[in-house]
Every structure is written in structure tokens, then in C-alpha cells.
Amino acid sequence: MRRDISIERLNFSKQMQFIKLVICCWLVTPSASAISWRECANQEKVWYKTPEAKRIGDNVLYFQSDLGGWYKNDGSIHPSGNAAIDIRSKEGQRRHKKSLQQLKYPCTLDNDATWSEMRFLAKVYAATGQQKYKYGFLKGIRYLLEAQYPNGGWPQFYPLRPGYSSRITFNDSAMIGAITIVDDVAQRRSYYNLADEKLRKKCQTAVTKGRECILKCQIIVRGKKTAWCQQHDQQTFEPAQGRISENPSLSGAESVGVVKYLMTIDKPSPKIIDAISSAAKWLHQVKITGVRIYNFKDDSLPGGADRKIIADPSASPIWARYYEIGTNRPMFIEKGKVKYKLSELSHAKRIGHLWIGGRWPESLLKVEYPAWIEKHQAKD
């Protein structure tokens, strides 16, 4: 006959052993392994010691290019954390690896690729001490140093893919993701104090060049510094065309990431302080008030939904993704042609992209920038 066991009947030591066993079982259950790649980056420290974290780390190493970078994490060519390359046969793994090696452009910074894998490897190494994760991380750092333009910018793809992918790319945090992790190595921060002195100094040089590039890319309108475009020309630093609906413009989204990075600099130069202050002023200037985005049902349309801008005096400020250089008018773009009303876009374009309604700068302007001002005024 089975005896029922109550945890309350156990002494304190046995209770603690039981609780630890439950936690360990939870950490390796299928529910834990089903987390997304983004969630993999933000787990508790203890999780990075688990078999699941190491399994994902091994997958990350498998998908690392011989050059040191990664292709974008799209769930097919490069599966995310819960994908199972490890359940394939050895022959299946070999064939798939060969197909990856045949990619013409195997490495990118698009969609957080490369730097996000590197951050994950550093955390798994810190938790496990297994050298293969450290080596993978350092291979990634060397790739980023190789990929950087002599003028300090980073392209979206390296080896260079023709077209907009060769531009200096702020879109989707490409350049900021790259310079931030190189800066972390240069400054020996936390998990990223992994480089020898020679490599660390190379990272310091790369960061200096990268910051100079950021300052050169800041768009000046009628003598005043404003913000950044998603892409900039790799020779002239001028705002440049991206994909067909990514016209040269001022970005209400990517500019926030640039400013936040610049604010991490411990001893900012007068030029960097001016760049931050000018961009924050511009972001405040272009906020859109008195309206909100209204998503509503419409069964006559594909997907049964539509979107429009409606008046709402009580609405919180919102921002547009693209602003016209010189006028600060929100831009809605289709096949390269600029519209000035959301309603002028086709239905597919109207609902398929967040042209307006984002609150990307909200926390920056309300919390982080005021705190930064206070911090640096106190230092002065």
C-alpha cells in the first residue's frame, strides 16, 4: 500500500532537499525548453548551468559560421533556443552544417544576430566554465572587429552583401548591438571580461572609431543636430535608402537605441553630450499628441481587421517610425513613394508595419535622459 508523504512531516534539511529537487526538475522540463530565443537571454543565473542551457549553447556553436558570426535567428536556417539540431542523426547534422557553409552571406547583425548569440555563450561559459563557449564568444568578437568599416561603422551583413545591406546600419539595433558588446569586452564588464589584453585593446580602438562614426552620422538640419536614419552611406555618412519602403529619413525608433548607448559612456566628451542632448530635444519635439491608433474589425478585408488614426485628447504621446528630413512630417511609404496619411497606404501596408503609434522614446525622455542629466550635472 502506498503511503502519502507530506512535506510538512519532513525535517527542515529534508524539506530543503525536496525543494531543490523540485526546482531542478522544473528547470529541465519541456516547458522550460520551450522558451523563445529572446527569453534565453534573460533567465536567472542558475538556469545557464542546466542541461537545457548547455544544449542550446551547443546549438549556438553548431550554427556559428567559420567566420565567427551567425545568420539571423529565423527559426529555420538558424533555429532558436528550443530548436533541436541535436536530435538529428550525425549524418543529418553533417549535411546541414555543409549547407550552412555554402551560404554566400552567412553572417549578419540583422534581427539581433551574432551579438545575441555571443551574449548567450558568455553567460553559459560563466555558469559552466566550459571553454568551448568562451572560444565561441571570442571568435564572435574577432568577427565583429573584422566586419567593422575603417570609418567605424558596421554593415548589416559581412562579408558584404550588395545593396542596402552594405550600409552603416542602425536598423533593428545592428550597429548598436555590435558596438555595445565590443564595448563590454573593452571595459571588462561582467560576463564579457574574456579577452586577453591584446584583443581588449583592439576592442577599445573599435569602440572609439564606432563612436566617431555615430557622431558623423547624426543628421544636421539647418545647422541643428537631430537624430539618425536607419541606414547611412558607408562613405559619406549621409542618410541612405534601405529596403524599398525604408526611405532616407529620421528614425523615431532606432535613434532611441543610439542615444541610450551614448548615455552609457562614463566620461562623455562635449561632442557626445551635445549629440545626446540634441537628439533628446528632437525626439521631444516630434512627439505626436491628441491622437491614438485604433485597430478595429472589418470582415470585408483580408484578415478581418484594419487600422486608423483617431482623435483622442487624453492619449499618451506617440511617435512615427519615419520622419521626413527637414519637415519632421511622419512618413508612410509604399514601394518607395511617400504618403503623409496612414489611410493612403494599401490595406496590407497599413496593417503590416508599425508606421506610427510606437512609444520608443517614452522611457528615455521621462526617466533615463533626466537621470543622465542629473548624473552629469552632479559630476560637473
Task: Identify the residue ranges that each predicted region occupies.
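Eukaryote-skewed repeat-based solenoidal scaffolds used as protein-protein interaction platforms
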Residues: 134, 138-141, 145, 162-218, ...
